[in-house]
């Protein structure tokens, strides 16, 4: 018995791995040997962009617009803090994948009992469906704003992006990364142009990045601040990142893993900085266009669109805003498909054809969106968008806590285990997020 226990400790995992994560693209992107730093960095760049997509989805837009229109530039510091937390958690996710060769779903399935693993899978699937609902809503609103397509038809049209995803997966993983990066740049350029048109107060922006005591003392401001924090770190991103870092052909040796961890950190930090700039730009735009003109109650994305042209005095302001929204929705679609595949294969060891997997997720997202749109129209759509963010908040801790557990476990991580200082910080962040999301859930239920 003692010998068996010792052997299991050495192995650190209960079962041998059945298949690598995302086996069709695992170890598929070449890394040039003996290349210079920037050439290698370019080869590693890409996964971070796919992760950053989750930080600029329509759910984030709603909280940033509300924060900027109601409280000006004050909540910029909250966006900055959220981004720092995101960098920490995403670095842990990528390290788990690189060191162990398992994604977060595979690691959770091995570590926990079957019943609890099944519960984690259900929660992860709910989070992915909630994310997909936000993508569907964002794309449908953008199609309505740009082309006048009724919301209910816009929701149905979003089903067609399944074929885009399948085509890109067939062409190769690098193609997906290029498309995502292109759309991210589109969003950044759009909001950069909007910011120039809005003539923001640069001194107020600089002050906004310094945390203010009123964020805690003002209940209304605190709620929106918590909403920004709660909607920033997406649970499906942790599963996704731990998998897609393994698409690179780095040497599966001690030195190879060290190098991969270093380049992956640079990649994700750079991409999340772009996401920070986008989210900050949305809040700055809302503050400059609405808060300073006395329009403090901009309720949703459509309201912001309608108010931009008369407020900024430019006929293209609203169009640029809608193009960025469409790019955001389509971008998130690409990553949602991959995340769904990862959690199903990792937790259940069930491998579905990509078309079946994508159809399943999209149908489960479209059905509630169609029903709510048909019954309640645009107001119902905005309520559904908010509800999807609550679902994500509820699930987040069930991804963060296992991630911190595994990366702090020397048996699983070996010499790559989190050092003591990082363990303390990681657990503090995990507990903080858990308390935050419990508060958000309680507040949402009591205000229904």
Curated annotation (Swiss-Prot):
Q: Which gene encodes it?
A: mntH
Q: How does it sit in the membrane?
A: Multi-pass membrane protein
What keywords does the record list, in alphabetical order? Cell membrane, Ion transport, Membrane, Symport, Transmembrane, Transmembrane helix, Transport
Gene Ontology cellular component annotations, sorted alphabetically = plasma membrane
HAMAP family in alphabetical order? NRAMP
**Residues making up the signal peptide according to the UniProt record:** none
Q: Tell me the protein's name.
A: Divalent metal cation transporter MntH
InterPro entries linked to this entry = NRAMP_fam
Q: Which organism is it from?
A: Listeria welshimeri serovar 6b (strain ATCC 35897 / DSM 20650 / CCUG 15529 / CIP 8149 / NCTC 11857 / SLCC 5334 / V8)
Provide a Gene Ontology MF annotation, just one. manganese ion transmembrane transporter activity
GO terms for biological process? iron ion transmembrane transport
- Residues crossing the lipid bilayer are 41-61, 69-89, 117-137, 147-167, 176-196, 215-235, 270-290, 307-327, 363-383, 384-404, 424-444
Q: What does the function comment of this entry state?
A: H(+)-stimulated, divalent metal cation uptake system.
* Localization, UniProt: Cell membrane
Which family is this sequence assigned to? Belongs to the NRAMP family.
